[in-house]
């Protein structure tokens, strides 16, 4: 009997029934199908549409990436910054970061603009408002071959810190590059002077450096300074070239407000972009701007807070100012928004938020041009002056942009001189 059973098993193995082969084949095909579907889902879940070159008005791209409900959601959502406090002054907040659920709940209770106003700590300036969209990207007053460009005369690397115990400001001039590149003159050597504004107090003068466009200064200066003076003083870094007649000629200057650096809390170190002294002095007012970028929502927020000491065009005694903000990509105008008009006010408070959809992959190709203009009856308006902010510009424009990128999700506010057009 045992032999018969063994022979039966051997016969089944050598020549199995047809129905059993079919069951095995169907099971194998089912497993292969499940594996193929799983791999396909993994593949499609990791793929995204290529970035749109027009992220602010190509909603097909946004719908493809975020779903059909994104257009409605983008009108209701607000960036959930991690820090509860968002001013650039003072230590970082110790409160926990806002969760998405908490943010949406706050939006439902307060409304998105009121919540943003609380995050930016703009209560002293009134209610935060939404800016107006501007349809025209080719207005007569803004068309120019150099619309999104700002020129630099070299860079200097500096560092500074404040000793609260001795009330002393320490300034170090580390190095410079491309300092003597001027077409109209040739210089054999140069030096740098550091002064404290507005009193023009000399902080220090570097040694003369010869025959070098890239220079290592490595010099340190100190000046007594009361803590209250940090809010009103500025440092000016001036580079002078020495020509063949031994004359000192200004080849570039940059000014840095101490109030934006938080020196009592942490040292500052960075590259500053030099400008022509004539352009730096040709200011027609100042404007306070706040920038923040939320990478998860790919959203750039610009808040036009206020302006002061505006000088009107054509020696006017009065005018009605407003602000236009252009988003530029590689110098091309991609989007434009503007504030409301303020009537007869050289120190207007705008307090308006402008939100741009910006994929992170194109962030380094972007810049902002902020133009202060005068409203007119024909609707065209005369430009008072402008500010350019971005990675490829100079002065405070690049400092503000880099600080925004260094503190993602946290708005950074800075004053900018408004340069005459």
Curated annotation (Swiss-Prot):
An annotated GO cellular component: hippocampal mossy fiber to CA3 synapse
Annotated localization: Cytoplasmic vesicle, Secretory vesicle, Synaptic vesicle membrane
PTM info: Phosphorylation of Ser-97 is required for mossy-fiber long-term potentiation.
Matches recorded under CDD domains: C2B_Synaptotagmin-12 (cd08406)
Cross-referenced SUPFAM superfamilies: C2 domain (Calcium/lipid-binding domain, CaLB) (SSF49562)
PROSITE patterns named among the record's database cross-references: C2
Membrane topology, from the record: Single-pass membrane protein
C2 domain span: 152-272, 283-416
Keywords: Cytoplasmic vesicle, Membrane, Phosphoprotein, Repeat, Synapse, Transmembrane, Transmembrane helix
InterPro entries cross-referenced by the UniProt entry: C2_dom, C2_domain_sf, Synaptotagmin, Syt12_C2B
Transmembrane feature ranges: 19-39
Tissues and organs where the protein is expressed, per its UniProt entry: Expressed in the brain, specifically by neurons in the hippocampus, and in the adrenal medulla (at protein level).
Main location: membrane
One GO-annotated biological process of the protein: presynaptic modulation of chemical synaptic transmission
PTM annotation (Phosphoserine): residues: 97, 99, 214
Cytoplasmic topological domain: 40-421
Vesicular topological segments: 1-18
Gene ablation phenotype (knockout): No measurable change in basal synaptic strength or short-term neuronal plasticity. Neurons from the CA3 hippocampal region exhibit an impairment of cAMP-dependent long-term potentiation in mossy-fiber synapses.
Cited function: Synaptic vesicle phosphoprotein that enhances spontaneous neurotransmitter release but does not effect induced neurotransmitter release. Unlike other synaptotagmins, it does not bind Ca(2+) or phospholipids. Essential for mossy-fiber long-term potentiation in the hippocampus.
Assembly, per entry: Homodimer. Can also form heterodimers. Interacts with SYT1.
Similarity comment: family membership: Belongs to the synaptotagmin family.
Name of the featured protein: Synaptotagmin-12
Originating species: Mus musculus (Mouse)
Lineage, highest ranks first: Eukaryota, Metazoa, Chordata, Craniata, Vertebrata
């Amino acid at each position: 009997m045992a032999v018969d059973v063994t022979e039966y098993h051997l016969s089944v193995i050598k020549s199995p029934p047809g129905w059993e082969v079919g069951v095995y084949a169907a099971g194998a095909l089912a497993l292969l199908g499940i594996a193929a579907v799983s791999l396909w889902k993994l593949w499609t879940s990791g793929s995204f549409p290529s970035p749109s070159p027009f992220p602010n008005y190509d909603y097909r791209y946004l719908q493809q990436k975020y779903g059909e409900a994104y257009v409605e959601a983008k009108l209701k959502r607000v960036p959930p910054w991690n820090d509860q406090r968002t001013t650039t002054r003072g230590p970082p907040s110790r409160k926990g970061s806002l969760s998405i659920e908490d943010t949406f709940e706050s939006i439902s209770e307060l409304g998105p603009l009121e919540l943003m106003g609380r995050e930016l700590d703009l209560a002293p300036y009134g209610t935060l408002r939404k800016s107006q969209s501007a349809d025209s990207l080719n207005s007569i007053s803004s068309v120019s071959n150099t619309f999104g460009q700002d020129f630099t005369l070299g860079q200097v690397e500096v560092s500074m810190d404040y000793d609260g115990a001795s009330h002393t400001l320490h300034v170090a001039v580390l190095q410079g590059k491309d300092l003597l590149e001027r077409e109209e003159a040739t210089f054999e050597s140069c030096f740098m002077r550091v002064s404290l504004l507005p009193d023009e107090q000399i902080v220090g003068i570097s040694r003369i450096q010869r025959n070098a466009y890239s220079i290592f200064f490595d010099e340190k200066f100190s000046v007594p300074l009361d803590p209250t003076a940090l809010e009103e003083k500025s440092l000016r870094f001036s580079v002078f070239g020495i020509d063949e007649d031994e004359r000192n000629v200004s080849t570039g200057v940059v000014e840095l407000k101490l109030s934006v650096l938080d020196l009592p809390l942490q040292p500052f170190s960075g590259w500053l972009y030099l400008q022509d002294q004539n352009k730096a002095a040709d200011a027609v007012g100042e404007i306070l701007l706040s920038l923040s970028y939320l990478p998860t929502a790919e959203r750039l927020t610009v808040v036009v807070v206020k302006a002061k000491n505006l000088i009107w065009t054509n020696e006017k005694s009065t005018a009605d100012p407003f602000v236009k903000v252009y988003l530029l990509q590689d110098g091309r105008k991609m989007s434009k928004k503007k504030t409301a008009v303020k009537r007869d006010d050289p120190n207007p408070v705008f307090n308006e938020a402008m939100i741009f959809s910006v994929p992170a992959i194109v962030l380094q190709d972007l810049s902002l041009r902020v133009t202060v203009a005068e409203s007119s009856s024909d609707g065209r308006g005369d430009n008072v002056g402008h500010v350019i902010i971005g990675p490829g510009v100079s002065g405070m424009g690049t400092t503000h942009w880099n600080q925004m990128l260094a503190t993602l999700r946290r708005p950074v506010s800075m004053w900018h001189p408004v340069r005459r057009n």
